[in-house]
């Protein structure tokens, strides 16, 4: 038992990198763009942490170059959807009872990975899968998503603190308990923003909910890179 009231690091907005000629971030991004452009990624469904290759394959192409295939996506059917729901509900007891600061710590670590070693990878997948410029990708898939995970972790603390009743009558001690949903959250996310696509399922998870994430069919490469 921890006798403390944890407070996450004070969130700050992630600085936007410039990608100027000769800069480190530009060189890393160019390398990653070449790598991802030169391969066709086989993307499975992810169910209970396991890769599931269904064989029902749809090719993903660059929006700005329809002749360039960048991924082969294994689509989920009824069997896979039901398995994903069962897996989410199977994790409910463990995840919903985990201390909120432990859940927040997972996403704060993810934000640090994104701002460092995974930044070029995520930005490159957004550029290739959504036809965004390096600056658009940097603002969206890197900075905004980093900010979502940082600020949402602190917002969780605020929710747990601010919802406590301000007054307790004599001989009573009022308190409020914020509980996750009993079911699961089904997140159907848009094509145009990498950050929003990742934020919809993850903000629910920070608050103790389990879920099933269904990215829009046009941007599976970007979603897969974000998840992994």
Question: Where does each model-flagged region fall?
Answer:
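Hydrophobic face of amphipathic alpha-helices that form TPR/SEL1-like repeat modules
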Residues: 1-70
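Hydrophobic, small-residue-rich alpha-helical packing segments that form membrane-like cores
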Residues: 146, 150-175, 180-181
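A short hydrophobic/small-residue beta-strand
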Residues: 211-212
